[in-house]
Amino acid sequence: MMTQTDLSAFFGADLATADRDIFDRIGRELGRQQNQIELIASENIVSKAVLEAQGSILTNKYAEGYPGKRYYGGCEYVDEIETIAIERAKALFGAGFANVQPHSGSQANQAVFMALLQPGDTFLGMDLAAGGHLTHGSPANQSGKWFKPISYSVRQQDQLIDYDGVAEVAQREKPKLIIAGGSAYSREIDFAKFREIADSIGAYLMVDMAHYAGLIAGGAYANPIPHAHIVTTTTHKTLRGPRGGLVLTNDEAIIKKVNSAVFPGLQGGPLEHVIAAKAVAFGEALQPSFKDYARQVVANARALAEALLKSGVNIVSGGTDSHLMLVDLRPKGVTGRDAEHSLERAYMTCNKNGVPFDTAPFTITSGIRLGTPAGTTRGFKEAEFTRVGELIGEVVNGLAVNGPEGNAAVEAKVREEVLALTGRFPIYN
């Protein structure tokens, strides 16, 4: 039995006192985020308000069900918070209905599959090698095991979506659902064209806007809501909120199916502390300043791509219309894995990534994916990202000449410049 002293420590001790092992490692991770340039396209830096909401006492509350229809008592205030999150999400994207409960973008996608498909049904998504996502039909993913996925790709000559190819495979295979969106496609997607193709065969159109959601909210990328039957997204990445998922639609019949798929179909109790953080992030994204942020993310990405091209580094499709780009390292004779590791030693974090028509194993890859959301959040503009592009070029060109074991001098030089740059743009001080 806990004594009064035990209780006082339980409710009063901070993390540094209660668990030094975890506290120390969080501190080291904070230092990494402060000192390194985050170029992973799916990562961002959230506000203190988002952190406070997610770390709040709402983590104590179980709330199975939906606002006003819970299976537990004591939900008065979490009902209000979840309702605020729903209304803000609807306003942010111009949607009639929203479900803010999915724990992740993957679970949001799974909810749509459960709502609209039966096991064994055919759906059409972008090939993973062309820039799609695991949940769009990879054989390693549930979506590729429970359903019959077919894929479309990009044109070899320009690495842009082959809309004629999409239409051709749709007419031939008659999928029940078509997915537009991906995790490594840098160009603007023609959602109206996808809807036209879906309507021609009586299919649902689902848009996975996880990577572009913040740009869409800020008016810097086309909004799929007027075109899609249903839209899924994460709430982090460019949207700059906590890690989680969101489903949007203008169709009342579809949202009823999705709500049932999320709970009780896939999840039990929602994470109300995360939903509160989502609400805070949606509120931030509704502010006029977020439009400036979204535009700056795209401007920075274009500056980064241009600097890389001038450094002799190849960009898939020749540039970007969004926050991300794929670097094709095959002309340099460098692997994505080696580039990722070398850049990290130079204090620039990215991820190895396959490129269209890549023949390298997925654990090695022939490319890297780069993004500008986190750097833009900490205050970088075009001048800073131009310099970042030049520094990446130095590391990659050094790898091409020196190999991964001989690039230490280049990495050390670049690391000093990175530290000077991040020192000018501090976070969480």
From Swiss-Prot:
- For the ligand ((6S)-5,6,7,8-tetrahydrofolate), the binding residues are 128, 132-134
Q: Which InterPro entries does the annotation name?
A: PyrdxlP-dep_Trfase, PyrdxlP-dep_Trfase_major, PyrdxlP-dep_Trfase_small, Ser_HO-MeTrfase, Ser_HO-MeTrfase-like, Ser_HO-MeTrfase_PLP_BS, SHMT-like_dom
Sorted alphabetically, the keyword list is:
Amino-acid biosynthesis, Cytoplasm, One-carbon metabolism, Pyridoxal phosphate, Transferase
Which residues are annotated with the PTM N6-(pyridoxal phosphate)lysine?
237
Disulphide linkage map: none
Catalytic reaction(s) noted = (6R)-5,10-methylene-5,6,7,8-tetrahydrofolate + glycine + H2O = (6S)-5,6,7,8-tetrahydrofolate + L-serine
GO molecular function ontology, one term from the record: glycine hydroxymethyltransferase activity
The protein's annotated pathway: One-carbon metabolism; tetrahydrofolate interconversion; Amino-acid biosynthesis; glycine biosynthesis; glycine from L-serine: step 1/1
One GO term of the cellular component aspect?
A: cytosol
Q: Where in the cell is it found?
A: Cytoplasm
Cite the EC number. 2.1.2.1
Please name the Pfam families in this protein's record: SHMT
Q: Which interval of the chain is the signal sequence?
A: none
The entry's family comment says:
Belongs to the SHMT family.
User: What does the subunit section of this Swiss-Prot or TrEMBL entry state?
Assistant: Homodimer.
**In UniProt terms, what function does this protein have?**
Catalyzes the reversible interconversion of serine and glycine with tetrahydrofolate (THF) serving as the one-carbon carrier. This reaction serves as the major source of one-carbon groups required for the biosynthesis of purines, thymidylate, methionine, and other important biomolecules. Also exhibits THF-independent aldolase activity toward beta-hydroxyamino acids, producing glycine and aldehydes, via a retro-aldol mechanism.
Task: Return the PANTHER family for the record.
Answer: SERINE HYDROXYMETHYLTRANSFERASE (PTHR11680), SERINE HYDROXYMETHYLTRANSFERASE 1 (PTHR11680:SF35)
**Name by which UniProt lists this protein:** Serine hydroxymethyltransferase
What is the scientific name of the source organism? Caulobacter vibrioides (strain ATCC 19089 / CIP 103742 / CB 15) (Caulobacter crescentus)
